[in-house]
Amino acid sequence: GRVKVVYSASHLLHNPEVEIERSSAHSPFEHTGRAEKIRETLAADDAFEFVSPKAWGTEPITAIHNEGLLRFLSTAWADYQRDVKESREVVPDMFFKSNLREKMGDRVEPESVNGKLGWWCFETTTPLTVGTYEAARGAVDVAMSATQIVLDGAKNSYGLCRPPGHHATSDLYGGYCFFNNAAIAAHHVAKSTGTKVTVLDVDYHHGNGTQQIFYERNDVQFVSLHGDPARAYPYFTGYAEVTGSGKGRGSTLNLPLPARTDDDSYMSALEQACESIK
């Protein structure tokens, strides 16, 4: 049979015109055209059949993410227009760092939307727009629906998720990611079937969010090939010596690749990644 591709046009609602990256404002690298190019290519191939996602609600999201992050993203853009100024894109001015409040008692989410932006977001390239929350919810529905197709008996499926997800941690958004689509789907499989799940991440950047979410769990393995964080985003995570902790010790495998890695070296690393999946 044909491979089912789950796609939602809701991703078009997240359409920022600018991002702040490398000390400059420019048009976003993560834009609607990325997903549309994939859609057009697959739609022209008879091997694929397009289906729409089902609505899964917020429960799969809050199984993985802090409810405060969900609540914030649902109103943040509108709150900013009301409380700060009218702005097509909304980004933080300041980020919370734990040592700002070292020895000063419990951390508390700020009341102002400017404070909340820096509380829930970790970098500047991920603007909120009027439709971002709806698009992010749609991407979760796509991931969950594609996963359910396999749970219902299909050999495979493809979830065309946008916005992406693997940089979103349990309580932070950033790196173009709002909710961690793959982590939400992997958790759903692990909990509904009782079987071990592996997330194999082959994006150029390390999936810091997916790693963080499953770092102390042994029911979801995280395996990642990525550019060496000594020189590549997200810089702070993705090192080979990081392998999980507690029950999750040994369930994380990072394979950082040096600059100018050729095809043979990449395939060798991919083979190592696949052999680790059990």
Q: Predicted regions: what is each one?
A:
Residues G1-L200, Y204-K278:
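HDAC/HDAC-like amidohydrolase catalytic core signature
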